[in-house]
Every structure is written in C-alpha cells, then in structure tokens.
Amino acid sequence: MKQPLILSFLLLGMVSAFHLETAHLENPKREESLKQEADGSREQGRELALTQETKQTEGEEVEGSQHQDIFEDEEAMESDPDALNKDSACPKEEDTTHFQGTPGCKSCNYVLVRTPETFDKAQRVCRRCYRGNLASVHSYSFNYQIQNLARKINQSIVWIGGILRGWFWKKFCWMDGSCWDFGYWAPGQPGSGGGHCVTLCTKGGHWRRASCKSHLPFICSF
C-alpha cells in the first residue's frame, strides 16, 4: 500500500519539475520576443520622426523658393539710398528731359532720365541727384502727360514710383509715401503680372508689373 503511494509522489514531483523547467526555457524566448518588438517600435518611431522632419525641411525649401522673388525685388530697398553709390555720376543733362506737372505748381517738377537703371538704382538717383523720388501718379491727366513725353523721345516703357510690398497682405505703395488713389492698369494687370515694381507703357499709357531688376528709363519727381 505504501509503495504505490510513494511512486505517485515521485511521479508528481517529476511532472512539476518538468513544467518548471519548460516554463524557465520558454520565458527567455518570450522576453527576447518582447525585446525585439520594443526595438522594432523604437526604430519605426525614429523613421517616422525622420520622415516628418524631411517633409518639413522640403516644405521650408519650397516656401523659401516661392519668396525668393520678393527678397530679390525688395532687399536693396532696405538700404539707405543716400549712403549707396555716392561716387556714381548723376545723369548727364543731354540724357534727361525736364518738365512741369500741373501748370503754375512750383513744386511739381519732373525729370525723365533716359539712362536705363534698375528700380532701386533709379530711386537712388532720384534721391541723390534731385532730392526727390520716382514719380507717383494720381490722375489720368498726369499719366497722359508722362505717356506723351516718353513717346516723343522714343521711350516705350519707363519706371514710375509704384512697388508691391508686404507678405500676406500685399499692397501697392508709392516711393514718395503719397496715397495710392489712382491706377491705370493694362488688361489682366496687376493680378496676372510678375514682378513687384510698376512700369508705364507709352503705347496706351497703361501700367504693368515688372521685375525690379529690369533696366529701364525712369521719371523722378522733385
């Protein structure tokens, strides 16, 4: 009677030991599997962060290229006009045509300079040589006067003092700071035009946007 009982206890002990050993063998495998899963999750997280960072960088590059035109057109306008090109000669008299705007207005003096310059250089010439600015236009009659004068001396397009400024809220401004209260845009302008500076075309007298780096004759008011 005792012998079968002893055998039963021995058998039960062997089974328990087998289960413990099996659990001990399986546990490292489970730990290794969990470790691999954790490593994979961390790697996926790093890849996702890198992808997001790359997309952000690409977006910034695209945005930067879209605004490059504005920087190129406006960066020089931030400088002090009187401090630049002081040693440059003013236009020769034979390259200019003086005229008066409103009859009897002593302060309404204008000069058309036939020497082509960029918008920025033209503004600096107006400031330094004539103590004025690129001309602002506030009426059809004066616009027509400029148109006729430029056409008579064979100038097809000239700078006037208008420039597009701003980022999200863009607006046209005159270089002399006067109110923008008149416009004579060509069909489709200014919305479909490129560039940030304003020209007057003598054929029709309409205004068009152009790159501020273009070299054109210009009109100063002083």
UniProtKB/Swiss-Prot annotation:
Keywords: Disulfide bond, Lectin, Signal. Disulfide bonds join C126-C220, C197-C212. Expressed in bone marrow, spleen, and thymus. Not detected in heart, liver or lung. InterPro entries: C-type_lectin-like, C-type_lectin-like/link_sf, C-type_lectin_CS, CTDL_fold, EMBP_CTLD, Eosinophil_major_basic, Snaclec. This is Proteoglycan 3. Residues 27-100 are annotated as: Disordered. Residues 105-221 form the C-type lectin domain.
